[in-house]
Design a protein with these regions (language model features):
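Class I S-adenosyl-L-methionine-dependent methyltransferase catalytic core
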Residues: 1-179
Length: 179
């Protein structure tokens, strides 16, 4: 079963792309919600991430499969040293870009100090907690990581529901001003 990135989440993720970015990769494109939000960029969406030639991108935006049983195109005998599939793809992408925006399971950071330290050493700029209802039928809490190579300040924690409430309030305030 694939879990399609909801369009609102895809838009939120793409809003985090650095302004000077041109060449963007979505290494694990599924139904295309993230891809649809990337118009105006030179987008690379390989049909098989595992067969891709090494390259460098201005930014990578992705929602990788969290488990190898949901990943397509894995080479026979592929060994990823016991890492969960999504985390493996994330670490490979860290070699290909200075900016990564990734929808990941919360346990990527909550059940391993080693993974958290590794992400922070790259530059874990922000983590946005997503609502449990983000993916219907999924039992995994998810979040969006914003990685920026060299970022060494405190990681910013956000709650997606609060971002939406603030945005709606701002729109209401603007409407009130126009009356």
């Amino acid at each position: 079963m694939q879990f399609q990135t909801p369009i609102e989440i895809a838009k939120y993720m793409c809003s985090m792309i650095p302004h000077n970015s041109i060449k963007i990769m979505e290494p694990t494109a599924g139904s295309g919600n993230i891809l649809n939000c990337l118009s105006g960029y030179q987008v690379i969406a390989p049909s098989n991430f595992f067969d891709m030639e090494p390259d460098f991108f201005d930014c990578i935006v992705m929602n990788p499969p969290f488990s190898s049983k949901f990943a397509f195109g894995i080479p026979e005998g592929f060994e990823h040293k016991g890492m969960r599939m999504g985390y493996y793809i994330l670490t490979e992408c860290m070699k290909m870009s200075d900016h990564i925006i990734a929808l990941m399971p919360w346990f990527t950071i909550s059940d391993s100090d080693v993974r958290l330290r590794y992400l922070k050493s790259f530059g874990l700029k922000s983590i946005t907690a997503l609502p449990r209802k983000t993916f219907q039928y999924a039992r995994i809490q998810t979040c969006v990581f914003e990685l920026d190579r060299g970022y060494c300040n405190e990681t910013i924690f956000r709650v997606y529901d609060e971002i939406i409430k603030k945005k709606e309030q701002n729109e209401t305030d603007k409407d009130s001003e126009m009356d």
